[in-house]
Amino acid sequence: MVKNLVLWVVVAVIMMTAYQSFNSSSVENSTDYTTFVYDVSNGQVTAARFDANEITVTKTDGSKYSTVMPPLEDKKLLDDLLSKKVKVEGTPFERRGFLSQILISWFPMLFLVGVWVFFMRQMQGGGGKAMSFGKSRAKMLNQDQIKVTFADVAGCDEAKEEVGEIVDFLRDPNKFQNLGGKIPKGILMVGPPGTGKTLLARAIAGEAKVPFFTISGSDFVEMFVGVGASRVRDMFEQAKKNAPCLIFIDEIDAVGRQRGAGLGGGHDEREQTLNQMLVEMDGFSGNDGVIVIAATNRPDVLDPALTRPGRFDRQVVVGLPDVKGREQILKVHMRKVSVAQDVDAMTLARGTPGYSGADLANLVNEAALFAARVNKRTVTMLEFEKAKDKINMGPERRTMIMTDKQKESTAYHEAGHAIVGYLVPEHDPVHKVTIIPRGRALGVTFFLPEGDQISISQKQLESKLSTLYAGRLAEDLIYGEENISTGASNDIKVATNIARNMVTQWGFSEKLGPILYTEDEGEVFLGRSMAKAKHMSDETAHSIDEEVRAIVNRNYARAREILIDNMDILHAMKDALVKYETIEEEQIKQLMNREPVTPPSGWGEPKTQQAAYANSTTNDTKPESAVENTDDFNV
């Protein structure tokens, strides 16, 4: 606020000075003293105003001009003016004190000097003060401000064990120093977005009870040259004054990217900042008691000099949680929500493979919002299922009008997926089938894995292929080949990619054998070539296409045979989907056993609740979900 006030004062003084200069230069027309005397003698002057040695003259025609009286006594002038009956006026001399004269004379200079001193003092300050570009933007949090502990971090037990030594060192450094051991100078936490890297860093500071400096990698480099390196120096100077302490640099790949990489060349500001960081972390001057923790989801782009031992001695992988980790994370977030007794965290964890900690937190929040919309006192399993479906596939599009024929076609399509997925060997169990449009999909078939899959066998892949093609085959068997819709476009895309990877990467072709036919050339910005080298002949490429086609045809034929043998179940499942729109695991088992179908949970709830569930604006799609396919209706 003070800086803005000073700025406006400076602008006002400049405008006043300009106005006065303009005013003084734009007064009445000036002429010589001889003309004035001539006009007086000819009787052309009606009034004369004397202001020191300046005379303002008014002529008989009303025009005015000014002239300056020379420093000579003209005793005859007054007599001539009076004889011609000219109105004579005078201005008294302004009597100013000595101090007033000095103030008026020196005020502009003193004012400018004061403004200059003000800005110079601001430059010596830190933080966000004026022109303090070289000061660190790191925010320091004291131990009283950090309330996060290891109890708030779940799903990454291995990572917590890795960083546990840091906490012990910060609590009792002599324990390690007496034995001659050295604590790691830096820890690089690597993992996908949302896995809890920042949360884990805050938990380390909360457990160790030490100051915590936090900054983003993008906060170093500015528009001015040298600012990034200056901020790095200032950050480490502040950290040394508060040692022992932690420095957390989030998204370090913004400043620690590999030097000399990319399509361009030459030196840039980012490299200068990185060089200064390398020196500060492991240079001639030590930084004992200062531990640097950095987080990134792109470790492959970091400079090797930054990740070597002595700077970041230890890399801690904070990966996506497994089913047990997801259960623990869900329980942590459910503490803040009033959850009903029917909510099973393990069931939710099984149905959310590939979810990060942030995704699970969003799942719990969405379920709470669903319950609040219908004025429930607790969050039930129904709200969690609706929240999971919304995150996986987007909100329900109940306003989308589908004809009876479109509903029937979609029901046959999804029933084909469900029947083949239920009967092929080693496939994930069918969890839910719906024909309610979600996002870009007209219908969805959900499969619930029994556990996390670290690797997948050839039999599982081929079962997946049969299931993917089953939706298209169901339409073919019911309506004929000429009436197949474009709903299977995404199924075909996914199946083709799986079949091609089986041949070119995973060695599941007897003819071509376990040979890699594709190579990852890396990214262009890492200094690698833009051109992709061809590692196979045209004959080999033709053989690959033949093997891919053989795998697809084999599983296509198997899916057709399964559907032909179970046409009665296909028709019954279609009828159930048209009636209920969504069927769950219990109804699917009844249909597969050819038993009467009971209504699914939530069937018959008030329309107001259904509308409240449907009125959702978030479209947070997640491609790594347990959804088997999405029937894209856009051609």
UniProtKB/Swiss-Prot annotation:
Listed GO MF terms: ATP binding; ATP hydrolysis activity; ATP-dependent peptidase activity; metalloendopeptidase activity; zinc ion binding
Keyword Transmembrane helix: yes
Transmembrane segments: 5-25, 98-118
Region (Disordered): 593-635
InterPro entries for the chain: AAA+_ATPase (IPR003593), AAA_lid_3 (IPR041569), ATPase_AAA_core (IPR003959), ATPase_AAA_CS (IPR003960), FtsH (IPR005936), P-loop_NTPase (IPR027417), Pept_M41_FtsH_extracell (IPR011546), Peptidase_M41 (IPR000642)
Active site: E414
Membrane topology note: Multi-pass membrane protein
Cofactor: Zn(2+)
GO aspect biological process, one term: proteolysis
Gene Ontology cellular component list: plasma membrane
Keywords in alphabetical order: ATP-binding, Cell inner membrane, Cell membrane, Hydrolase, Membrane, Metal-binding, Metalloprotease, Nucleotide-binding, Protease, Transmembrane, Transmembrane helix, Zinc
Recorded superkingdom: Bacteria
Ranges in the topological domain labelled Periplasmic: 26-97
Entries under CDD domains matching the protein: RecA-like_FtsH
Compartment list: Cell inner membrane
Biased composition (Polar residues): 607-620
Protein role: Acts as a processive, ATP-dependent zinc metallopeptidase for both cytoplasmic and membrane proteins. Plays a role in the quality control of integral membrane proteins.
Family: In the central section; belongs to the AAA ATPase family.
Subunit record text: Homohexamer.
Name of the protein: ATP-dependent zinc metalloprotease FtsH
Organism: Haemophilus influenzae (strain ATCC 51907 / DSM 11121 / KW20 / Rd)
Biological classification of the source: Bacteria, Pseudomonadati, Pseudomonadota, Gammaproteobacteria, Pasteurellales
